[in-house]
Regions:
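Basic/hydrophobic alpha-helical interface regions
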Residues: 5-25
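Subset of outer-membrane beta-barrel
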Residues: 27-31
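Short, exposed beta-strand/loop patches in secreted or surface proteins that constitute
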Residues: 34-41
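Short pre-active-site segment immediately N-terminal to the catalytic Zn-binding motif
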Residues: 45-61
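Active-site recognition of the HExxH zinc-binding catalytic motif
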Residues: 59-75
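Post-HEXXH active-site segment of zinc metalloproteases
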Residues: 71-101, 105
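Pan-zinc metallopeptidase signature
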Residues: 86-88, 116-193
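Short glycine/serine- and small hydrophobic-enriched flexible loop segments
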Residues: 108-112
């Protein structure tokens, strides 16, 4: 898949405008995140690591917008996504995987809403790899940028489908953090295909 950086920059600009003008969610570039993380959210705002390349920022912004939508529609999903779960049982892991999938389905809808349909495959590939990394992390606590036997044992790569975005009024969590989106970008990739 050969996509120019200019395309990611253009798409990111459109997503940021949609976030501000349609969803009324503020996206803030910041260097004030724990180094272990590259993004955070509170339901009304998204903080994104300012050092990210546009491609990585685009994925993380649309992913976090998806979670922001979830948080504003469901207190249960807000509670689920507000903590990093360590070694969840299989039932909770499945809920977490479905939560991640749904966020990316909202992200796909956002891309389509701004007229971008040529990044569907790219988004699916980013989501698929993210699911492998997250699944390994959830089950082991190990931050590893790899497709492992553990992540394959709990494989979850449903195809992304547009999910309509209901109207909502964004509201923020009362507590603050310094990161929730795990940064796998600076790790050596192993076993990726």
């Amino acid at each position: 898949m050969n996509i120019s950086q200019q395309r990611f920059t253009q798409a990111l600009k459109g997503v940021l405008e949609y976030s501000k003008n349609v969803l009324h969610i503020e996206v803030i570039d910041t260097s004030d995140l724990d180094p272990y993380f590259k993004g955070d959210l509170d339901g009304k705002r998204i903080w994104i690591a300012s050092a990210l390349e546009d491609e990585e920022e685009l994925f993380n912004v649309i992913h976090l917008l998806g979670h922001s939508i979830q948080w504003n529609l469901s207190k249960e999903l807000r509670a689920l996504g507000s903590v990093l779960h360590e070694n969840p049982d299989d039932q909770l892991l499945r809920k977490l995987q479905e939560y991640e999938w749904e966020a990316n389905c909202y992200g796909l809808k956002i891309l389509h809403e701004i007229g971008i349909r040529d990044l569907d495959r790219w988004l699916f590939e980013k989501y698929r790899l993210d699911m492998f990394y997250l699944t390994h992390y959830y089950k082991t606590g190990e931050k590893l940028k790899a497709i492992t036997d553990v992540s394959l044992a709990y494989q979850f790569t449903w195809p992304l489908v547009e999910k309509n975005i209901p109207e909502f009024i964004p509201y923020a969590n009362p507590e603050t953090r310094r990161g929730i989106v795990i940064d796998f970008t600076n790790l050596t990739a192993k076993g990726l295909s």
